[in-house]
Design a protein with these regions (language model features):
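Active-site loop/oxyanion-hole signature of alpha/beta-hydrolase fold enzymes
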Residues: 73-108, 125-126, 151-153, 158
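Conserved hydrolase catalytic core segment
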Residues: 109-144
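Conserved loop-alpha-helix segment in the C-terminal half of the alpha/beta-hydrolase fold
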Residues: 233-259, 263-266
Length: 283
């Protein structure tokens, strides 16, 4: 099932109020009339980000009565000082598991951005009894043959040449620097200068092992957990390809398209919050 922005704003009986989304260079403002169903969300950031990237969306969901957690994984954001060469995918999976277990969260709508798709899949595999729905926000969907952020040669197990070249530029040999490899347009277009300024202030290097570690599943990962994909089709520079989307266009998935950039939670927080809120009404 593919859902587009218009369907979300119409609400389909979910009690949502349509909002005008500005695209003039500033992030949108305003509030939505959400439905009364109370859900628990755990919003997981992607590469180079921290929990801060979800704050505007979280504020809107909380205003609607939902419980929302925006944890920051080890070695990222305000926890950047805890980084080290040993920090990898399993570290980040454990970070998020600890939130679910220590906060005693159940019926969680677990959302992951970008390459945290592997992280949330690992969490879902180990704590599937706590997950109501898993949501990939323009994220990598792990599956057989692609269980890490970097696809290895299937015959030799080697990393691709482009990755080996990038490794030479890593900070201290293990941290990926966004600005070394990509322009701001990787995250948002130049029509959002305020958001870009925020990103320049808050972006931190990212532990490369979170990309390169292979995810090992024992209990099906995202399968059977109402998997949902939100595709940011407004991304112009290096749009997420089908290599990221993988099986998410299949019949067992809910597939949503939003005309927003990769960091759409910053440029269009109300639309993203409205979209996530609508998922709380779907069983």
């Amino acid at each position: 099932m593919t859902i587009r922005r218009r369907d979300i704003l119409l609400g389909s009986g979910a009690g949502l109020t349509a909002l005008a989304v500005t695209e003039t260079g500033t992030a949108e403002s305003g509030c939505a009339s959400f439905s009364a169903h109370r859900s628990t969300y755990v919003l997981v950031h992607g590469t180079w980000h921290g929990g801060w990237v979800w704050q505007e969306v979280a504020d809107r969901l909380r205003a609607a009565g939902h419980r929302v957690y925006t944890p920051t994984c080890t070695g990222c954001g305000e926890r950047f000082h805890l980084t080290g060469p040993e920090v990898g995918l399993d570290t980040h999976i454990t970070d998020i598991m600890q939130v679910l277990e220590c906060e005693d969260l159940d019926n969680v709508i677990l959302v992951g951005h970008s390459f945290s798709g592997t992280t949330i899949t690992g969490v879902a595999d180990r704590l599937r009894e706590r997950i109501q729905r898993i949501v990939f926000f323009d994220a990598l969907v792990p599956r057989e043959g692609r269980m890490s952020g970097i696809a290895r040669d299937p015959d030799t197990g080697d990393f691709p040449k482009w990755w080996k070249e990038r490794e030479k530029q890593f900070i201290d040999g293990y941290q990926m620097d966004l600005w070394q490899d990509y322009p701001m347009e990787m995250l948002v277009p130049d029509t959002f200068p305020e958001v870009a300024a925020k990103l320049r202030r808050l972006i931190t290097p990212h532990p490369a092992k979170q990309w390169t570690d292979e995810l090992v599943l024992a209990d099906g990962g995202w399968q059977g957990l109402n998997p949902t994909y939100i595709h940011c089709v407004g991304q112009a520079y290096r749009k997420s390809s089908d290599l990221m989307v993988g099986p998410a266009r299949g019949p067992d998935w809910k597939f949503i398209e939003l005309d927003i950039p990769r960091d759409g939670m910053l440029t269009h927080p109300t639309l993203v919050a409205t979209t996530l809120n609508a998922l709380s009404n779907v069983r």
